Structure formats: structure tokens, C-alpha cells
Design a protein with these regions (language model features):
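Alpha-helical structural context detector biased toward long hydrophobic helices
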Residues: 1-268
């Protein structure tokens, strides 16, 4: 059966940001369409759901679930990987298949936000179901190209960061279009993955290192948070309301709209 409720960021990842509001457990987030600071009880993360976003209708009326199925395969690895990273136990995690799935899932999260999908649908210039199929095909191509580009990179996971991290609907921060060979992604409020090219040109596969963060990593955590807020278009999650309140002036609907007006769709 085709899945209707598509999470643009898996709830298995978002649950690492669970916080409290009074006696209730849930997720603190800013809704960027209104600037409101919100709290959603539970772990469902319904604010990250868009119905049928990855399963466009074909000409015969059926839905194409190839992309959703593709995402689902790697999400299992990401859920385990991120939970271990958040707990600081990733160093003992040696399941190479799940590690590869997790890193692939991280890379895919650079392209799969509902905002990015709707931009691609609009930019296709058609008004029928083919626009949605076109957007899905573009995600498949661009994500495949990124998999190849990062396939020999070195990835470092830091845990126990001194600065709490944010996460948005576009959590995989790719700096390569800006001329910097680096990627960042939060795996939990205190856990960050950093990717950089390998110095060894003979390497044929990606590598992973894990280690505790130190005071010197405050700067990279702050760079991550600044870019997360700058690139967010729908919502931003933090582990506490106070973290979001500190961001509110930079995430007003007016400022987010101004950033949206500079966005462009890149077709692969």
C-alpha cells in the first residue's frame, strides 16, 4: 500500500530532539510561515509530514512509490546511527551496511524537503501530474550524483558537543556549491557529522571516524546552527524553547520570505 504521510525528515532522527513542556514530552519548533514558537506533544513530528510528497500520480492514476521506498531503505540505518551518535556509543557500531545506509540517508536529506519539491514542481512549467513526476526524477538524479561525489569522503562524528544543535527540514548542509569542500549534519542535539574530501587519491570508499567533541568545536557547531537557520524555509527544531526564542528575531516570516526570493531550482 502506498504511504500517504511522508516525513521529509524521518521521525526516527527528530526524536533525538525530544524536549519537555511542563509534564509533556514532545518537540519544540518554530513554524517559519508564522514565526510562532510551537510545541508538539509526542514523537510523531506531524509538522514534518506532507501527504504524498514523494509518491506522485502516474498518468493511469496509480501512485509511483519508488522514491519513498528508496528513502525508506536507508532510513533504518540512519535511525540506528543517529541514536548511537546521540548516545555517544557510535564508536562501537561496526555494522558497515547500516553505516553506509545512514550516510546515504544523510546525503539524501539535502534534497528531499517539501519546500524543495514544491519549487521543482512549480519550476517544471507544467500543471498536470507530470510536474510532480519530474520533480521526483530530479531528486533521484541529483541525489545519485551526490552519492557519487561523496563516495570517497571522510566522515567524522563528534558527540558531547559544547553547543546544542538545531535541525531544520534541510538538515544536510552542503557547502560545496559555496566553494568549500565540507558537509555538516546534526545527528542529535549534541552530535554532529562532518564530511570532507579524503587526502588519499587512491581511496575507493568512504571512511568514518568517531570521537568526543572539545571546546575547540564550539565554532563548527555555531557555523552549523547559523547555516541551519539561514537555509530553513519551513521549520526549525531545537531541544528547548529557550534556544528557539533566541532565534526568533532572525526567523520572522518577512526575513524567511526574503531568503526564499533568492532560492533557485537546480536541475540535474
Amino acid at each position: 500500500m502506498v504511504k500517504r504521510r511522508n516525513h521529509e525528515v524521518p521521525k526516527g532522527l527528530l526524536k533525538s530532539w525530544l524536549g519537555r513542556e511542563g509534564s509533556k514530552d514532545g518537540l519544540h519548533y518554530i513554524d517559519l510561515s508564522t514565526g510562532a514558537l510551537c510545541f508538539e506533544e509526542g514523537r510523531e513530528a506531524s509538522f514534518a509530514i506532507t501527504d504524498y510528497i514523494y509518491v506522485p500520480k502516474r498518468l493511469n492514476g496509480e501512485r509511483d512509490d519508488a522514491l519513498e521506498d528508496w528513502f525508506a531503505v536507508d532510513e533504518n540505518g540512519l535511525a540506528v546511527f543517529s541514536q548511537r551518535a546521540a548516545a555517544g556509543t557510535l564508536a562501537s557500531f561496526t555494522n558497515e551496511k547500516l553505516i553506509n545506509q545512514a550516510i546515504r540517508a544523510c546525503i539524501a536529506l539535502g534534497n528531499r524537503s517539501a519546500y524543495s519539491m514544491f519549487m521543482a514542481i512549480t519550476a517544471s512549467g507544467t500543471a498536470d501530474n507530470s510536474a510532480h513526476e519530474f520533480a521526483v526524477a530530479n531528486i533521484l538524479r541529483s541525489t545519485g550524483q551526490k552519492f557519487k561525489a561523496f563516495s570517497t569522503w571522510e566522515f567524522l562524528v563528534l558527540y558531547n558537543l559544547p553547543v546544542p544543535l538545531l535541525i531544520s527540514e534541510r538538515p544536510f548542509l552542503d557547502f560545496t556549491p559555496r566553494g568549500h569542500d565540507m558537509v555538516l549534519m546534526a545527528l542529535g542535539p549534541r552530535s554532529l557529522m562532518i564530511g570532507t574530501p579524503c587526502d588519499d587519491p587512491s581511496r575507493r570508499q568512504m571512511s568514518l571516524r568517531v570521537g568526543p567533541a572539545g571546546p575547540e568545536h564550539k565554532r563548527i557547531a555555531r557555523i552549523h546552527n547559523r547555516m541551519s537557520a539561514e537555509m530553513a524555509r519551513q521549520w526549525v527544531v531545537a531541544s528547548s524553547r529557550s534556544e528557539l526564542a533566541a532565534l526568533a528575531d532572525e526567523l520572522t516570516p518577512e526575513k524567511v520570505l526574503a531568503r526564499r526570493q533568492t532560492d533557485r531550482v537546480i536541475f540535474s
